[in-house]
Amino acid sequence: QTAIAAGSSSRSSKLIHGGLRYLETGQLRLVRESLHERTILLRIAPDLVRLQRFHLPVYRSTRRQAWQLAFGLSLYALLGGFAPGAGFGRVPRREWQRLDGLETRGLRHVLCYHDAQTDDALLSRAVVRSAQELGAELALPARFTGARLAAGGVEVRYTTPAGERACHARVLVNAAGPWAAEVARRVEPAIAVPAVERVQGAHLVAP
């Protein structure tokens, strides 16, 4: 509403990933779609999205066995279409000491895999800039106030500092993130939308 990437888009985990943890809940389709998007972004925006290596240490006290994690990583790679450079493997014992900050007492295995990292705000601005180059118009700051669906498309209403405005479009894309349900409630006639579940997560990134 106020600026590009002013909300969740600049407060994400900074990762472009398939959601390794979603394999536990059987959300294979979600993981596959996310990994497909990761592959596309790595190809079209290599200056903004790059592969990042992750390590999974397995200790005597670790709840999951190494073979279970290896199976999950192999499924992750399979769903990702075995993308070049995004594979997984085991880190040899002789290389453990090179991993800064890794506690080696009780350590039994170290697995590694790859996902992608980005600057989410820069990526969002790049997407908007690309859309403008293809003919899109940007209204900012602006607040969506409502829309009416019709056979010929959709009439969209929004406000700017200059007052209320309206435009006609063939398609309305609801990309409001956490506010998607609020946006949907302002569309007439009422449409059924899936419930939006707000979740929180954290990734610690150390140089």
PLM regions: where:
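A conserved short coil-to-beta-strand element within the FAD-binding core of flavoproteins
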Residues: 140-155
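Flavin (primarily FAD) binding-site architecture
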Residues: 174-190
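Core beta-strand elements of the Rossmann-like FAD/NAD(P) dinucleotide-binding domain
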Residues: 162-171, 175
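Helix-loop-beta segment of a Rossmann-like dinucleotide-binding subdomain
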Residues: 96-134, 155, 166-167
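Dinucleotide-binding Rossmann-like beta1-alpha1 core, especially the glycine-rich loop
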Residues: 14-98
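Central beta-strand plus flanking loop segment that forms part of the substrate or channel wall
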Residues: 16, 191-207
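Glycine-rich FAD pyrophosphate-binding loop
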Residues: 1-11
